[in-house]
A protein has these predicted regions:
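Positively charged n-region of N-terminal signal peptides that target proteins for export
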Residues: 1-4
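Catalytic glycan-binding domains that act on GlcNAc-containing polysaccharides
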Residues: 15-157
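N-terminal signal peptide c-region/cleavage motif recognized by signal peptidases
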Residues: 9-11
Length: 157
């Protein structure tokens, strides 16, 4: 009876924000743009902790914390819509990957600090917050990869 009550009373938007729905969106867009789903999941975890309604002090919003100009450039009209946000965020990440010739550290630094900053400074001018961001995403990415290996019956040793 409780399940029926929850399904009837929850707004439709809440059903579209289930973790399994978000994981499906991540998997789909990651594959479309040639990324490992765990990388996109790691960015989401670091950027918003999976909160579809997250807003930063700088004005970034949604799961992948898109700034208004970035969202507009990649066709995202509603930054709080998980499907649009993930699609736009992954498309932006692919653009950054191409801009920085596949260098993941520069790609992630640019996702965090902006591509203009990285084009000007690269990682030669260490910015503690930017380096910490890149390291945090890399750490979460590795953790998620190991979790997948274990879930699929592999061994961590």
């Amino acid at each position: 009876m409780k399940t029926f009550f929850l399904l009837v009373c929850l707004p439709a938007i809440a059903l579209s924000q289930r973790p399994s729905d978000i994981a499906e969106l991540v998997d789909s867009w990651a594959v479309t743009y040639g990324f490992e789903p765990e990388l996109i999941q790691a960015i989401i975890e670091v950027e918003s902790s999976g909160n579809v309604k997250a807003v930063s002090g700088a004005g970034a919003a949604g799961l992948m914390q898109l700034m208004p100009a970035t969202a507009a450039a990649f066709g995202v009209r509603n930054r709080f819509d998980p499907a649009e946000n993930i699609r736009g965020g992954v498309a932006y990440l692919a653009w950054l990957r191409d801009l920085f010739a596949g260098d993941r550290r520069l790609m992630l630094a640019a996702y965090n600090a902006g591509h203009g900053w990285v084009l000007q400074h690269g990682l030669a001018l260490p910015s503690a917050p930017v380096v910490a961001y890149v390291d945090r995403v890399a750490f979460v990415f590795r953790r998620l990869r190991w979790e997948r290996v274990l879930r699929e019956g592999g061994s961590a040793l």
